[in-house]
């Protein structure tokens, strides 16, 4: 676990962070440019010194200003992947990977190389690598130092779209197969949806929201950054069954089910789906005959008027589903908090 309780004045920005981050999975640090994202992880790794407070990683005190404790970066056991890979140009890939490698990681060298798909690059120099290949090597080098925590500062920011698409699957594999907590700085909501388990939203140096991705996404914290036509819900589901006759998979959403195109995952595998608010219509009674496969029981939590539309927050079991309808539809259905109804979902996408 990473415990943060510190403040730091950085020019006109006052960074004040109070948070406990989990000891597993990817925690995304999200915010616009200047929100304090990179400043936060620089304080964690020891590149800057907080003005006051404590930083504790797995019960090891890294910073305690009252006790005058400030552990230097090289003693914190933290890996750092920068926006630019920062490889040594005079070393081949193999040499870059072995630079700073912990003795106990020698036996895992081949596993990490295979995980990142860089076996064929070992004898090449950094100048001959693409941006995505350089970042994979940088990630491998960080992992081979045997870190207790891995920091990634917008690792896709300097890459063009094809290179981003090349690297994302490796990051997804990394999150699932390497048992090291990762702090992932990004201002891209798409990256967060694909990769993050937890999210911390920073705004002007302060924590605006934090928690599981599904919970933070369902709150109002991220909604200002989403274009009007991209307001959506993230739902946690698990594989229930495959359709006997059609290429469709049933996913369990609490005590209900959602049908999606065939998913090649084992039964009970957990994944996330994304549903755009504009693809959710509301009815008071379930339709008898309809082309829409997914009709879920839901209850109204609140209705919010936004730019001439109404965003309806629905409770589906323990999770939140958003619908966007017209004021006319809201009035016609006489929507009010606590009302039971049915949500018709026209389209579902798999995120992770």
Swiss-Prot record:
Main subcellular location of this protein, as a coarse class: membrane
Record keywords, A-Z: ATP-binding, Cell inner membrane, Cell membrane, Membrane, Molybdenum, Nucleotide-binding, Translocase, Transport
Top-level lineage group: Bacteria
Entry's EC annotation: 7.3.2.5
A GO-annotated cellular component: plasma membrane
Role played: Part of the ABC transporter complex ModABC involved in molybdenum import. Responsible for energy coupling to the transport system.
Protein name as annotated: Molybdenum import ATP-binding protein ModC
């Amino acid at each position: 676990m990473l415990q943060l309780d510190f403040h730091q004045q950085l020019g006109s920005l006052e960074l004040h962070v109070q948070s406990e981050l989990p000891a597993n999975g990817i925690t995304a640090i999200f915010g616009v440019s200047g929100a304090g994202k990179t400043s936060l992880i620089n304080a964690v790794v020891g590149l800057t010194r907080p003005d006051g407070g404590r930083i504790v990683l797995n019960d090891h005190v890294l910073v305690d200003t009252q006790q005058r404790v400030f552990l230097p970066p090289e003693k914190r056991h933290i890996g750092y992947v920068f926006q630019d890979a920062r490889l040594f140009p005079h070393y081949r890939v193999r040499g870059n990977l072995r630079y700073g490698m912990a003795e106990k990681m020698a036996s895992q060298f081949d596993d990490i190389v295979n995980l990142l798909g860089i076996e064929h690059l070992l004898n090449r120099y950094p100048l001959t690598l693409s941006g995505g290949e350089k970042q994979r090597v940088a990630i491998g080098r960080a992992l081979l130092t045997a870190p207790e925590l891995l920091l990634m500062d917008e690792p896709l920011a300097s890459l063009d779209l094809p290179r981003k698409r090349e690297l994302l699957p490796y990051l997804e594999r990394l999150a699932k197969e390497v048992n090291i907590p990762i702090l992932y700085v990004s201002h891209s909501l798409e990256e967060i949806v694909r990769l993050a388990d937890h999210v911390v939203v920073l705004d002007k140096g302060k924590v605006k929201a934090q928690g599981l991705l599904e919970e933070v996404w369902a709150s109002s914290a991220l909604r200002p950054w989403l274009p009007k036509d991209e307001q959506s819900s993230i739902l946690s589901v698990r594989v229930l069954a495959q359709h006997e006759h059609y290429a469709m998979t049933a996913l369990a959403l609490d005590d209900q089910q959602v049908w999606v195109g065939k998913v090649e995952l084992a039964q009970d595998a957990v994944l996330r789906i994304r549903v755009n608010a504009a693809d959710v219509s509301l009815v008071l009674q379930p339709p008898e005959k309809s082309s829409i496969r997914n009709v879920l029981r839901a209850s109204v939590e609140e209705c919010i008027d936004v730019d001439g539309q109404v965003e309806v927050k629905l409770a589906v079991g323990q999770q939140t589903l958003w619908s966007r309808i017209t004021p006319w539809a809201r009035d016609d259905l006489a929507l009010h908090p606590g009302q039971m109804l049915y949500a018709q979902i026209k389209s579902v996408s798999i995120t992770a």
